[in-house]
């Protein structure tokens, strides 16, 4: 049975194309300061001093922390573990998972907002970006400007700085499996093994790509934690949210105006809460899985 043909004079039906993936809009978060931002940077320093510093510590005549895969021995300060001791690793992972669930139930997404490597390295890379290209408005202006000497210089400097940090991160990662002093000596003499070259470059590329380009996309689409974290919330969980009863109806007004007499809430609709968000969401739309609870 044939479909009915459109009557003469009627407009032809339009085809609507639906994209399978959302087109990413580049986010330029505004720099923030304050108590929570200070805590976030304190944890950036603490985690990175731990990560970059541990391979340099010695315990007797060996590194304090070394996972010697070829010897099948794992040194953690005075503790020496063998493959048959991996049952202890299972216990550590179980305790870590339960701790994550506990802290999430009590205080929301503390891990995501303050200690997750994706958050930490994104903060570090955005700091480098701000130092070279300027704050939010300057970066947006640079994005929209045509390619010229200034743009090439700033973009090139940013990527060089990112690559230096990423490469050192990759070297540090491999130094947990090969003594760092021996590793640096063989890098200087171009005498690295194939697997060492692979893991240095792989970890460097992952750091550069995730923290420099993908950023909030990792939190939105790749990390499974965001999808089920709401199941760990209850009525007593501390969360970062918008107080609609206080803020609505939103609207601009002069500083001296009384919002109640104008029929307005406390929100002046300035949009700064959106500009400072590292995942680019509008917190006024309610609890969203994209929110990492950073309290920016």
Q: Predicted regions: what is each one?
A:
Residues 103-107, 209-215, 258-261, 265-269, ...:
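Short, flexible, mixed-charge glycine/proline-rich loop motifs
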Residues 267-268, 274-296:
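Structured cytosolic domains appended to multi-pass membrane proteins
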Residues 2-250, 274, 295-296:
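Membrane-embedded alpha-helical bundles of multi-pass integral membrane proteins
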Residues 244-266:
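Membrane-embedded translocation segments of transport machinery
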């Amino acid at each position: 049975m044939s479909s009915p043909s459109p009557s003469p004079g009627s407009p032809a039906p339009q085809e609507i194309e639906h994209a399978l993936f959302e087109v990413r809009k580049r986010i330029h978060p505004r720099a923030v300061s304050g108590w929570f931002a200070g805590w976030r940077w304190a944890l950036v320093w603490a985690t990175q001093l731990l990560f970059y510093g541990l391979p340099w510590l010695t315990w007797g005549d060996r590194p304090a922390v070394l996972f010697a895969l070829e010897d099948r021995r794992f040194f953690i300060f005075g503790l020496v573990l063998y493959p048959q001791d991996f049952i202890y690793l299972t216990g550590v992972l179980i305790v870590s998972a339960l701790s994550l669930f506990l802290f999430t139930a009590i205080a929301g997404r503390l891990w995501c907002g303050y200690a997750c490597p994706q958050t930490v390295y994104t903060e570090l890379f955005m700091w480098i970006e701000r130092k070279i290209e300027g704050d939010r408005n300057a970066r947006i202006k640079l994005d929209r400007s045509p390619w010229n000497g200034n743009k090439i210089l700033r973009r090139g400097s940013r990527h060089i700085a990112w690559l230096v940090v990423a490469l050192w991160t990759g070297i540090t990662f491999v130094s947990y499996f090969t003594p760092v002093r021996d590793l640096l000596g063989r890098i200087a003499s171009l005498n690295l093994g194939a697997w060492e070259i692979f893991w240095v470059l792989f970890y460097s590329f992952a750091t550069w790509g995730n923290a420099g380009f993908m950023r909030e996309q990792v939190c939105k689409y790749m990390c499974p934690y965001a999808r089920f974290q709401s199941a760990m919330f209850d009525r007593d969980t501390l969360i970062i949210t918008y107080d609609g009863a206080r803020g609505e109806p939103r609207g601009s007004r002069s500083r001296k105006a009384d919002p109640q007499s104008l029929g307005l809430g406390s929100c002046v609709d300035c949009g700064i809460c959106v500009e400072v968000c590292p995942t680019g969401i509008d917190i006024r739309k309610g609890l969203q899985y994209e929110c990492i609870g950073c309290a920016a």
